[in-house]
Amino acid sequence: MFPVELDNVTVAYHKKPVLQDISLQVPEGKLIGIIGPNGAGKSTLIKTILGLVPRASGDISIYGKDYKDQRTRIGYVPQRGSVDWDFPTSPLDVVLMGRYGRIGLLKRPKKADVEMAKAALTKVGMHDYAKRQISQLSGGQQQRVFLARALCQNADIYFMDEPFAGVDAATERAIMTLLAELKEKGKTVLVVHHDLQTAEDYFDWILLLHLRKIAFGPTENVFTIENLQKTYGGRLTFLKDKVLAEGHKE
């Protein structure tokens, strides 16, 4: 039984396919990068798995069941730009939202939930900012808060939509440390990622996506010049650098 399984999933906006015939069996305990050009359907794929975007056809299962039956096993970090950061709330309150899937929306968090939220903020270096207004934080700090919320969900599968976008180098390192720790705990982590320069170092599995699945598997097998050309059309300077680098290895 796979953490995530897709069988011939197609998604269309206004009858135009944006994802077509996607079939995947996501292995457990892997750190997986979802990579492709702008408009390739990377964020749409995550949102479709989470039931946020309807699919035109195909089947999706989480540990063999429907997403609705497995919500407590899933953590989600959306794109930072999709969040209303002017909403009057504190980092601690945001992180506590990660507990509501388990305690229920209408129940007050218990002391143990609050302590877990504080521990998650400490984990991402944001304990001292717990009571500030979320709008007063920098982009990197806001992203750390969302990561802390995901930690508080204590999930088995984590979906992260461009967690490195617009963050400073220190925050990027902190995020990668956190992702590595989740993997060590046997968690399955799927990350939408844009930076091809870091992809080989960051992920042990990669999904190359451009409306269709181009390739999916261990990074050393998938992240090849041929597959990148299929995904990006050979337009990237990175491909030239990779060709030169691989030429030097021979």
UniProtKB/Swiss-Prot annotation:
MF-aspect GO terms: ATP binding; ATP hydrolysis activity; ATPase-coupled transmembrane transporter activity
Identify the SUPFAM superfamilies for this entry.
P-loop containing nucleoside triphosphate hydrolases
Q: Which GO terms describe its biological process?
A: monoatomic ion transport
Q: What is its main location?
A: membrane
List, alphabetically, the GO terms of the cellular component aspect. Answer: ATP-binding cassette (ABC) transporter complex
Stretches assigned to the ABC transporter domain: 4-236
Which Gene3D superfamilies does the record cross-reference, listed alphabetically?
A: P-loop containing nucleotide triphosphate hydrolases
Please report the record's description of how this protein sits within the membrane. Peripheral membrane protein
Q: Which UniProt keywords apply?
A: ATP-binding, Cell membrane, Ion transport, Membrane, Nucleotide-binding, Transport
Q: Which SMART domains match?
A: AAA
Question: Is Chaperone a UniProt keyword of this protein?
Answer: no
Q: Where in the cell is it found?
A: Cell membrane
Look up the domain of life of the source: Bacteria
* Entry annotated with the keyword Transport: yes
Could you say which protein family the record assigns here?
Belongs to the ABC transporter superfamily.
How would you summarize the oligomeric state and partners of this protein?
The complex is probably composed of two ATP-binding proteins (MntB), two transmembrane proteins (MntC and MntD) and a solute-binding protein (MntA).
Q: Which PANTHER family match?
A: IRON TRANSPORT SYSTEM ATP-BINDING PROTEIN HI_0361-RELATED, METAL TRANSPORT SYSTEM ATP-BINDING PROTEIN TM_0124-RELATED
Q: What does this protein do?
A: Probably part of the ABC transporter complex MntABCD involved in manganese import. Probably responsible for energy coupling to the transport system.
Q: What is this protein called?
A: Manganese transport system ATP-binding protein MntB
